Amino acid sequence: MNLNEFAPFPLIDGHIHYPHPSQLSRLLDICDRLQINRFNVVCTPDRSRLSLIPDALHLKAQRPQQIYVFGGLDISAYFRAPAEVGQVFAAQIDQLLATGCDGVKMIEGKPDMRRMLPVPPFDSPAFAPYWEKMSASQVPIVFHVNDPEEFWDPKRIPGWAVERGWFYGD
């Protein structure tokens, strides 16, 4: 593919996972090679690390005019205060913005996250304060709300999805 055909248009990648600071140079090299003008690093819960936000903000500091960071919510609220997650998450928004995040990444709608976390229904009263805060503040959200239907069908699911543990059928 000749990317020069798209040269008059800025190329923005709205959804990049940044796994570890050891990948900083590699990620920046890839974005430069692909002529990505700006990109958004999304921070999701990680079973092996407390938070990806500090690493993502460090990456953003390398190129603040090019990189956005969407911080993830502190999922411990699902265990500590399940009936009050909306209040807890609403309070986290100001903290995320103050640290340099530009928005929020929610992966709680992904089926494997819903199996791992006691996430209340998104339209439940527990989430109301959070949605009100997000609406009033106009903070952008990247919200993973499900996975493709073939991830429930053993005959249709791609092998790469099975390898990642994303088969959800019986």
What label would you give each PLM region?
Residues M1-Q65:
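An N-terminally biased module of ancient metal coordination in phosphate/nucleic-acid-related enzymes
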